[in-house]
Amino acid sequence: MNDLTKFTNQIAKPETFDQIQIGLASPERIRSWSFGEIKKPETINYRTFKPERDGLFCARIFGPVKDYECLCGKYKRMKYKGVVCEKCGVEVTVTKVRRERMGHIELAAPVAHIWFLKSLPSRIGLLLDMQLKQLERILYFESYVVIEPGLTPLEKYQLLTEDELLDAQDEYGEDAFSAGIGAEAVKHMLMNLDLVQEKEDLLQELATTKSELKPKKIIKRLKVVESFIDSGNRPEWMILDVVPVIPPELRPLVPLDGGRFATSDLNDLYRRVINRNNRLKRLIELRAPDIIVRNEKRMLQEAVDALFDNGRRGRVITGANKRPLKSLSDMLKGKQGRFRQNLLGKRVDYSGRSVIVTGPELKLHQCGLPKKMALELFKPFIYARLDAKGLSMTLKQAKKWVEKERKEVWDILDEVIREHPVMLNRAPTLHRLGIQAFEPVLIEGKAIQLHPLVCSAFNADFDGDQMAVHVPLSLEAQLEARVLMMSTNNILSPANGKPIIVPSQDMVLGIYYLSMDRAGEPGEGMMLADMAEVHQALEAKAVTLHSKIVARVPQTDEDGNQYLKRFETTPGRMLIGECLPKSHKVPFEIVNRLLTKKEIGDVIDQVYRHTGQKDTVLFADAIMALGFRHAFKAGISFGKDDMIIPDSKDALVAETKELVADYEQQYQDGLITQQEKYNKVIDAWSRCGDQVANAMMEELKSSPIDPETGRQKPINAIYMMSHSGARGSPAQMKQLAGMRGLMAKPSGEIIETPIISNFKEGLTVLEYFNSTHGARKGLADTALKTANSGYLTRRLVDVSQDCVVIEEDCGTERALEMRAIVQGGSTIASLGERILGRTLAEDLIEAKSGEVIAQKGELLDEAAIAKIEAAGVQSARIRSPLVCEATQGVCGKCYGRDLARGTPVNIGEAVGVIAAQSIGEPGTQLTMRTFHIGGAAQVNEQSHLEAISDGTVQYRDIPTITDKRGRRLSLARNGEIVVIDTEGRERAIHRVPYGTHLLHENGAIISQGDRLAEWDPFTTPVITEKPGIVRYQDLVDGKTLTEQTDEATGMSSRVVTENRAAGRGKKEDLRPRLTLLDENSGEAARYMMAPGTTLSVEDGQQVEAGDILARASREAAKTRDITGGLPRVAELFEARKPKDNSIIAKIAGRIEFVRDYKAKRKIAIIPEEGEPVEYLVPKSRVIDVQEGDYVKKGDNLISGSPDPHDILEVMGVEALAEYLVAEIQEVYRLQGVKINDKHIEVIVRQMLQKVEITNGGDTTLLPGEQVDLEEMLETNGKLEEGQQPAEGKPVLLGITKASLQTRSFISAASFQETTRVLTQAAVEGKKDSLIGLKENVIVGRLIPAGTGAGMNRMRVAASSRDAALRASYRKLQESLIAPATAAEEHAAELAQGPEAAIGDDPLATVEGETHGTDADAGDYLIEGDEA
């Protein structure tokens, strides 16, 4: 019976294996897979369409073409199953075997496998320690190689040309040494390798080597050698003797009409291999001349190369139509390859798509499904229901009824659809809210109706968007759709925890209109008793929606009782108040104000937090209906006269024009440079544009009292739309009624002449032309942006996909310090915002009273945050995914709150993917451009600081000096001025440049608006710290010093220049500097002068402390492009080194200038104790420190954007995380996108998974190699007591690199560089234990996240239970063999516990960890044993 059910060798179910291993196939293995050798290149007979025998489609090898029928037709039907026909040799079985049976080709000469030869680094090359060039010369028959030199002076593996070989044979005799050519020679060389010996030699060499670069190469070779030893692969398997042939159904040949065939490219490639192989066999049999055989062998090698990876070496082999043939590698690679096309994304049944239209009368959980569509999608359910009701006898009849659409069918469709959710999806699905479940409502027509509130989640609009419908079939799928994916369960956005179901556009406008109050409306000051009176008064027109009235509004107290409370309000706001849920947590106050889109979002947020999901959904639906209704009733519209151009515009423009003319004159007079003029002009115009815009806004905002009626004039409609957040923005209004402002050239620079007109006035021809650049660039950008953003998301998902919450608490002691982000003068993100929804790592104690505000391990919710903010806490230590010590994934405590639910995160939540989606989804809103900032445009704004609040001022790390005028000057390079308000909170942190004039004492009390500091924005001074006499050193006129006279003012100044001696002779080593002599003529201080510095003192001048010796121009340091938008985010996540990166001090110590080279100078930091650290700095860069300065660890020696790798090395993981989070948030903040920090932290955690071994200890790990942190810990765990563990330092990998280095090779191969990943994995014999999400999708399992994680746990438990049962059955059988006596049985009954009597299954509580074996079952059988 068993044989009957097992038709064919059935494919293993995806649940039945735990790991997938990849390795090299030995020739024996390939032959064992094969069902026969393919000897002929023929495919099928073009007349009979029957496969040729021994050809590529041979039925004898691969199986029958028709089910249960041999080729010649002698045996037909099931009864001959398994018979092999003696005439045609075909086994009678199902055709499906043609999809799984393989064949092989026996090669007449071995060939090298191109993956192991050409995929960098070449594995064969590394093993033999030869260059790829040399290997290719051997393999493609260009030169001989010495395999065994014997006693001759030839080197082992030395290459010889034909002539050299003949000479050598003449000289030493033919048998004195062995040489070979082609793949055979390489195969010999690989077979003769003694890997274990090789490993020992390499380790020896590694220990003794002295050079810098050698160890890297040795480690590379060592890893390959070790991987061959560990994996059990043999090196000679990289050379093929047999080529496997994949099953014919996987490379089909289909006859087209007209006698032609469509075929898979693989067949062509195989045919070439077979043809050349057969020809080579014949040539060898005929004993053809060597040169001909050799040529044929080379061609065979090329044919096999093309089959495996076409185009990897030499020309691409093309088919008849000049199209490159798709080789086996191409089948896997890229978007169209097997991984991404068929395994990660499949097309599914039971789906349809149609245009969407708005469905404002739907409830939030519903969508309108066209009847026709529903009928088609739910067909099987309808058939089943028809059958169950006994309406149709047969399936055929049911089909007929459905096709005819009889009225019974529609009734049944209604029944089937009730409570059966469907999933709607809109492409592009950028985050998980792009697929949501709804209950279908049948509608006429052909378009899907979508609820307006979910549009923002789908990013849908109704201008012709289409959406797809999917039907969840199984009960579990329906359950998940209803419980997890229903639109009512997705009120909050997973990216930032704010509601995503927020009214937009018309609804916002309607609600804004309702909540306005206006002076002088009819009925102002009326007292109304309750809601009913308000409605009556509105009907009677006694009041308008905007009249200011006093009314009693029903409120709910904490016990749920209603009471009335008086409010000054308007009837419109009371209408909104009616929609609010009845709860004391959401009082009427929260809607008793002017509601813009942002405020409505806050109201929905509060309703959700305090009253729960159901009420929120009802409230959202109610407020939507209200908004639409009143937007319609208000009849808001605007005409061109609503765009009011401010009267002050002309005056402002004229004033700016004068300024610009003035700058032009200054430039002509030589007072300012071209660059400075440009910056000032741009500045002036942008200021003018802003002033015009402000004037316009003021004018639009004002709604004066109409003298005739005494009522306020209606407010400007355009202003209403913009201010409420319904549509339009101040920037757009500025273009309509202000001035268009400055435009950019295609190169990105800003054109100096602005567009003065606005769209209402109309542009001049020149202005119109200037504005076309920007417009066109915008369109081109948009197209690029989508692709770039999508790619960023894909890389992020790939790096973080296996990050899942796997346990409640990992118990780590580490934590991140969080404080408010203060930039310049304002708080960008308060402490509360940053720690909301996180877990505290230690008790928060109020400084003044010492009481504990929040406990360690508490999840901070809104209430706790309010307490913390009130107490004025400065910083808090919180848990973060970055410090989590869970081995795979993260733990719930470190992650904190699940943002989309507002509850602690569940185990199994795929937080990695959510993080990737949250960062990638707003990617399309970011800009693509790099901002070009011309020098002073940013700098000259700021030449002083003002206090933003009352309080005290504190200087951190600012040494000061007082000059002879009594001014305090800062000598700090990295000092900070901190403003602390009266409650002791840090309100602002400012970094000020060197030489700043500080106006207050440290700790002085200041009031708001006081000046704190001023500085010269254009130059950096060199200040002397001691009195003395100045001497010029190496400042030679004409070489390193020039006199420059300013034509405009006639003043001359001395400028240090770079010494470019004309003579080709020995260049003098001139290091221009000033030295300061003290009273004993000893050298007191040295100041190096960078080129471009203007000297302010004479040689021999007496100076006091605090005097300025020289000024270096700051212009040069500032003109660097600021990369913004998407490219910046990608740059940070890829951990790229910035172009002009800053140099960070690795240790604390004093600075010393060591010496100058041609283009660089060497500076060193001398610590108090220990070795000095040296840096090479290009001369073109301005060095921020002077000789003798004391620097702290992590200070900038040279300004620029820091290199994240440096930050990690010098400052550690926490500082790096802080930097990356701050920089990435900065980019998103500019676009007004909110993303929670923890998402970025999850990604950064994934980038920090690897460590570089610094000390191998007693392990097999080598210093300098990169391994997973887990791997290092595992290796250390295997050590004996007293052995030294390996140590390592964390390394930062960019997201692409990190994804390619995941432990799962399946996941890495499906990401990028497929061949390289698979080659590497095969050599190492990697096992993929299917831990991440992607691998499981690829092998077709449930992912180990969400409900899948639970299923996995259950499966493990079930299998261990099965094992226990099996063992108990065995016990039972054993007891049957020797029957027990009555007395023994009686004793056994008494010995049994009371559980046995209750009938509780003692095995029901089994929870195992592994797939059970009988051995595991031991513990559960104790009760049975006692018997």
Curated annotation (Swiss-Prot):
Zn(2+) 2 binds at C810, C884, C891, C894. One of its GO terms (cellular component) is DNA-directed RNA polymerase complex. Mg(2+) binds at D461, D463, D465. One of its GO terms (biological process) is DNA-templated transcription. Zn(2+) 1 binds at C70, C72, C85, C88. Its cofactor is Mg(2+); Zn(2+). Binds 1 Mg(2+) ion per subunit. Binds 2 Zn(2+) ions per subunit. GO terms for molecular function: DNA binding; DNA-directed RNA polymerase activity; magnesium ion binding; zinc ion binding. It comes from the Bacteria. Pfam families: RNA_pol_Rpb1_1 (PF04997), RNA_pol_Rpb1_2 (PF00623), RNA_pol_Rpb1_3 (PF04983), RNA_pol_Rpb1_4 (PF05000), RNA_pol_Rpb1_5 (PF04998). SMART domains: RPOLA_N. Keywords: DNA-directed RNA polymerase, Magnesium, Metal-binding, Nucleotidyltransferase, Transcription, Transferase, Zinc. Residues 1044-1065, 1394-1427 are annotated as: Disordered. The RNAP catalytic core consists of 2 alpha, 1 beta, 1 beta' and 1 omega subunit. When a sigma factor is associated with the core the holoenzyme is formed, which can initiate transcription. DNA-dependent RNA polymerase catalyzes the transcription of DNA into RNA using the four ribonucleoside triphosphates as substrates. Belongs to the RNA polymerase beta' chain family. This is DNA-directed RNA polymerase subunit beta'. It comes from Novosphingobium aromaticivorans (strain ATCC 700278 / DSM 12444 / CCUG 56034 / CIP 105152 / NBRC 16084 / F199).
